[in-house]
Every structure is written in C-alpha cells, then in structure tokens.
C-alpha cells in the first residue's frame, strides 16, 4: 500500500509542477543552442527496417517485418513494405553527409538482427557482409565527428527464431539475444560508446500481441478478427517478461566482458505518453497512475527494483503476470547506465470498472485511456490519428522518472511529428518546426528543474517506412522521393535545426 501511495504522490507533484510551469510560455518559443548544457547532445534517429532496404541482399535473412509486410500487404495501410525503404544500405554516406550538414552531434540507428545472424542463432553463422556494413557506417560517422548511438533490437526479430520457437514468446530467445548482443559489442564496441538494448518493448507488446496491428500480428479474435492466432490476456506478459530478461542478459554480458576495455554505456529506449487524469476525482487520479504503471513503469520498475510495478501485481489476475527469480531480480536491478525516452503524444485516463470478460493487457489497468475529454482533444492532431500534440507531456514524463526512479540519466531518443504524404515534394514543414520548438522548450524546462537529460534525438532523419502506415505519412527532417530514386531533399525543419545547432559553433 505504501508503494501505491508513493506512486500517487509522485504523480500529484508532477501535476502541480505542470500548473506552475504552464504560465511561463508563449505559443512558439525562441530557442538558442546555449539554452542547453554545453555537453548536451543533439542528434537524429532511424531504425534498420525503416530505412535500410536491401532486405534480400548480402546474406540478410528475413525478419518478422519482412514476412508481415510482404506476405500480408493488406496489413499495411498502403500495401507497401520495407524491402527498399529509404535505401540507406546503399546511400549511408549521403545520409551521414546530411547529418554533418545539419550539424548534429550524434546519430541513433539500429542494427538488423537478421543481417548479422540470418540463420536462427549463433550456430547458424555470422554474416560478415552485415558486420562490414555497420563497420562502414560507424566509421563514416566518426570521420565526420558524429557519435554513433546504436540500438540492438528495433522490433525486427529474425523470422527464423519466430519459426523455431515463437520469437519472444519462447524463453530460448533470452540467450539468443544475449549472444547477438555479444556479437555487436565485440565487433562495434571499440567505437560505439552508447548502446540501447531494446527500442520500445511496450510497443512490441501492445501492438504486436494485443492489438495485432504490427508484426507478428497476434491477438485475441475479439480484439481484431484479422489475427489468426494469439491471446491478448497472456501472451503480452510472456513477451514483455522475455524482453526484460533479454535486456538484462545483454547488459550483464557487456559489463562482464567489455565495459572495462571499451568504457561504453548501455541503456534502453522506453516509450510512453503522459497520462492526465480525466477529472479531478481521486478515482481518475489513481487510474492515471495505473495507466503509467502499465506503460512506462512496466519496463522501468524491473530495472530499478527487480520487480514489476505493484499495480500490475495487483491488477493482472489469474496468475498471468510472470515473476522474476531471485537471481533474475538481482541481474535486473540497476541494469542501465541511461534511459532513452521516446515521446510523441499524451492521453487522459479515466477510472472504469474492471472487466472479467474479454480481458487483455489493455483492460487490466481498469482505466480507459483516451485522447479526448468531453469531446475536446488533448491537443492538435498530426497526420496520424494517435499523434495528438501535447508538449507538456515530455516535461512531465522526465520529471516523473526523476522523482520516482532515482534520478536516472536520460536521453530523448525519439520525438517528432508526421505529415501526410501528398505525392508532391513538399519541403515546407513549419508545423514540424513548431512541434520541435515546443518540445525542446519543455525539455529545457525539465533540465532547469533538475531532470538529468543529456541529449535529444529527432525522429526522424529521413522519411521512411512507418510500420503499419507504410509510406502514407512522413516523419523526416529530410524528404525522400520514394518514386524518384530515393533522392533526398532537406526540409525547412532541417534548416531550422542547422541554424539552432550552428549557433554553438559561432560562439
């Protein structure tokens, strides 16, 4: 009970700070590079399946996203796939040149698991062409003075492991992921000093195993009749458990074998929106706290305490929530050097009666999460229906993590908004500039209060394959002409970042 009250107290403190800080800002903040700490890192981010292409080249094996998008095009909004994507596999030097031209300090990219290990696991052999590609990318970045931030897993589980034992549904994946991470550390760790084990494990769990709208597309039939298999009441928790253990094992390998010589840092990139109470009632405040427990805290709490959030323990009925052994708990506690925060949008949370039928991870918190209150959206909508713009949420999440989870070192590892694809080359993205200005100001506010934020990565450097939305929306600072040889055109927002970042060099 004490833990529940502590969580609610932290939540209320952040809400109170929100009210105080809300009075400080006008609509569009003016930013300077000097508003941020001298060592603050600015970068841009991508992921392997979304930008690389070359899906069937140089020995790469298929991932679950190749299968999901190529075999079932009806599951993608525009029927497309990432087989060519932004073609960064062939155009990586041009992309590094764009990063350098804009003035970014760092580049966050992910490594394609099946490009390194195309045949199940380590026993199937390492694909040297994959090693060579990432060595070339890393070396090109360093030659331009750009720090590589590498993500080991960004949703693209090898299809061979999905076939062998169900991917992250199988306990075997923990050791296979550990071995894959070991290969990455061994081959790239002499130059890569910032690692993220996983990107958004929450999205993997929610969209891949509850909603069924992302690979591998599993869910309960009552949630999505297009799912051919799955169980939204049990599978998400099994997958989440294995993701957490895989992270822990990878960090353990790094610390035991590589940290002393390579002197790098290992973290994880976690996503969550901020959840505001739907009303001022105590019930809705508790519902908002539960919504946080089942999203950000779900993956953060085990890394701090070695346990699941108490709200999850209390609300996931019927023995569906796995438990950590004493040995696993010890391994997980403190298994991060920094926490990546991916933020796009926020929601309201309203207390609702707990369901005893058609139960899933979504219903377990007994909280209805919605982007509207009394018919009014929490903020303006971007191109995607889920992306309602609420800049204060990024500050509130940073402060929440600071006060609840021992003041961790944090990076904003993704932040951005999209516009709809029109078929025309449109480089005037003033709405994106406003989005970044608003959110960066909120990050600066959080730092001024004491949040230990060390950097910010824009999503994304390039227009790319946006998962179930395909190419119907664009998140890039750089326009990619998918009908014209993947030619790149910097948008107005890229020039805005260049002006912001070049101030440092002038001074």
From Swiss-Prot:
Domain of life: Eukaryota
Keyword annotations of the record: Disulfide bond, Glycoprotein, Glycosidase, Hydrolase, Signal
Entry's family note: Belongs to the glycosyl hydrolase 1 family.
The keyword Nucleotide-binding appears for this protein: no
One Gene Ontology cellular component annotation held by this UniProt entry: Golgi apparatus
Enzyme Commission identifier(s): 3.2.1.21
Pfam families per UniProt: Glyco_hydro_1
Signal peptide interval: 1-22
Residues annotated as binding a beta-D-glucoside: 50, 154, 199-200, 344, 414, 459, 466-467, 475
Cysteine-cysteine disulfides: 219-227
Glycosylation sites: 81, 226, 358
Organism of derivation: Arabidopsis thaliana
PROSITE patterns assigned to the protein according to its UniProt record, in alphabetical order: GLYCOSYL_HYDROL_F1_2 (PS00653)
Keyword Transport: no
GO biological process: carbohydrate metabolic process
Active site: 200 (proton donor), 414 (nucleophile)
The protein's name: Beta-glucosidase 12
Catalysed reactions, semicolon-separated: Hydrolysis of terminal, non-reducing beta-D-glucosyl residues with release of beta-D-glucose
Entry's Gene Ontology molecular function annotations: beta-glucosidase activity
């Amino acid at each position: 009970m004490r833990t529940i009250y502590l969580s609610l107290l932290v939540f209320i403190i952040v809400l109170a700070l929100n009210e105080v800080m809300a009075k400080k800002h006008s609509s569009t903040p003016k930013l300077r590079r000097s508003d941020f700490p001298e060592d603050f890192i600015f970068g841009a981010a991508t992921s392997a399946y979304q930008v690389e292409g070359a899906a069937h080249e140089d020995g790469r094996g298929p991932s679950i996203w190749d299968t999901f998008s190529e075999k079932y095009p009806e599951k993608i909004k525009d029927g497309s796939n990432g087989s060519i994507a932004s073609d960064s596999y062939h155009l990586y030097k041009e992309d590094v040149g764009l990063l350098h031209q804009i003035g970014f300090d760092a580049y966050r990219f992910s490594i394609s698991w099946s490009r390194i290990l195309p045949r199940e696991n380590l026993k199937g052999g390492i694909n040297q062409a994959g090693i060579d590609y990432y060595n070339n990318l890393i070396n090109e970045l360093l030659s331009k003075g750009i720090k590589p931030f590498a993500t080991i897993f960004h949703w693209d589980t090898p299809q061979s492991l999905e076939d062998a034992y169900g991917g992250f549904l199988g306990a075997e994946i923990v050791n296979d992921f550990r071995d894959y991470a070991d290969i990455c550390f061994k081959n790239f760790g002499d130059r890569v000093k910032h690692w993220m084990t996983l990107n958004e494990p929450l999205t993997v769990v929610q969209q891949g195993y509850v909603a069924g709208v992302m690979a591998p597309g599993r869910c309960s039939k009552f949630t999505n009749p297009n799912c051919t298999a799955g169980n939204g009441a049990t599978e998400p928790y099994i997958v989440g458990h294995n993701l957490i253990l895989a992270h822990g094992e990878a960090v353990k390998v790094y610390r035991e074998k590589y940290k002393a010589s390579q002197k790098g840092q290992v973290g994880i990139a976690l996503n969550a929106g901020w959840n505001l109470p739907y009303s001022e009632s105590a019930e809705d405040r508790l519902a908002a706290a539960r919504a946080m427990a089942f999203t950000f805290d779900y993956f953060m709490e085990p890394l701090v305490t070695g346990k699941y959030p108490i709200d999850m323990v209390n609300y996931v009925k019927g023995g569906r929530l796995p438990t950590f052994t004493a040995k696993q708990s010890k391994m997980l506690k403190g298994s991060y050097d920094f926490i990546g925060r991916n933020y796009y949008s926020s929601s309201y949370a309203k207390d609702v009666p707990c369901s005893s039928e058609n139960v899933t991870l979504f219903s377990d918190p007994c909280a209805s999460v919605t982007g509207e209150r009394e018919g009014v959206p929490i903020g303006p909508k971007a191109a995607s229906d889920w992306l309602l713009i609420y800049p204060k949420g990024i500050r509130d999440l940073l402060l929440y993590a600071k006060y609840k989870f021992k003041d961790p070192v944090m990076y904003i590892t993704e932040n951005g908004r999209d516009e709809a694809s029109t078929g025309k080359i449109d480089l005037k993205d003033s709405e994106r500039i406003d989005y970044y200005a608003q959110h960066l100001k909120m990050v600066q506010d959080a730092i001024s209060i004491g949040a230990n934020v060390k950097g910010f990565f824009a999503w994304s450097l390039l227009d790319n394959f946006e998962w179930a939305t395909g190419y119907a929306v664009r998140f890039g600072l750089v326009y990619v002409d998918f009908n014209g040889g993947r030619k790149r055109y910097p948008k107005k927002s890229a020039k805005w970042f260049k002006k912001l970042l070049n101030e440092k060099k002038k001074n």
